């Protein structure tokens, strides 16, 4: 089959959005093949320009960076310099509002009204002790203020995902002093375990956790391996994520 897809760079979190319709059962296989062809890619989503726009990640998880990228793709299709969109995204119970605006340098600034987490709990996890877990519909994020050796973190992610009963899990290594955040994301349905350059839902989880911890609204700028994401959060779950997106190229291949 011929497949058309676009490559995006949202804060280093290299993302493929497939524009050709693909049956849901085939999406993990197609995603795995595309990630072989584009080895710097960290995730794959399947895009439909309907009303609202639909975005399904290969593992059925939620992804804020891919949501922002989908808004950029829709703006490019409309030949628009700015766009306010509502996007139906896997792993989110309700459609997600997103806005993007093109910058003179060619990249886009985007904001996404992130879904409110279902819960924040403290969970006893092997190798980490009692740690906060921020649970979204499509992913659970574990906030870790103490480092773990990378091999241990990579072994722990699948076990913790199973223990939490989550569709996907993020291990968020947070340095409160510097604002540094290093995310490791495991998505079993897609068969991926990735040290991501940035993680939008992980950034949101940290913002919400800090707002609840401090009992007041916070604005956090989190420095990640691929760049900076900004989250404005309050304890009631109003969560606005801001980041940058570059559209790299669009390809059509036989697969």
Residue ranges of predicted features:
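Surface-exposed beta-loop interaction hotspot
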Residues: 112-155
């Amino acid at each position: 089959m011929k497949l058309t897809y676009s490559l995006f760079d949202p804060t280093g979190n290299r993302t493929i959005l497939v524009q050709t319709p693909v049956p849901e059962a085939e999406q993990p296989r197609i995603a795995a093949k595309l990630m072989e062809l584009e080895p710097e890619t960290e995730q794959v989503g399947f895009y439909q320009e309907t009303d609202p726009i639909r975005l399904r990640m290969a593992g059925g998880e939620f992804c804020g960076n891919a949501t922002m990228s989908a808004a950029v793709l829709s703006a490019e299709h409309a030949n628009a310099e700015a766009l306010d969109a509502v996007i139906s995204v896997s792993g989110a119970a309700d459609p997600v509002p997103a806005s993007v605006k093109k910058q003179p340098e060619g990249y886009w600034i985007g904001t996404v009204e992130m879904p409110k987490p279902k819960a924040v709990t403290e969970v006893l996890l092997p190798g980490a002790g009692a740690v906060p877990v921020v649970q979204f519909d499509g992913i659970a994020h574990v906030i870790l203020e103490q480092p773990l050796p990378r091999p241990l973190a990579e072994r722990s992610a699948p076990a913790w995902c199973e223990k939490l009963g989550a569709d996907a899990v993020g291990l968020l290594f947070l340095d409160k002093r510097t604002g540094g955040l290093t995310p490791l994301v495991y998505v079993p349905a897609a068969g991926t375990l990735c040290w991501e350059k940035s993680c939008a839902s992980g950034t949101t989880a940290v913002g919400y956790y800090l707002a609840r911890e401090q009992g007041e609204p916070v604005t956090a700028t989190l420095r990640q391996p691929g760049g900076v994401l900004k989250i404005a959060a309050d304890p009631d779950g109003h969560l606005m994520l801001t980041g940058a997106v570059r559209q790299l190229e669009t390809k059509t291949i036989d697969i």
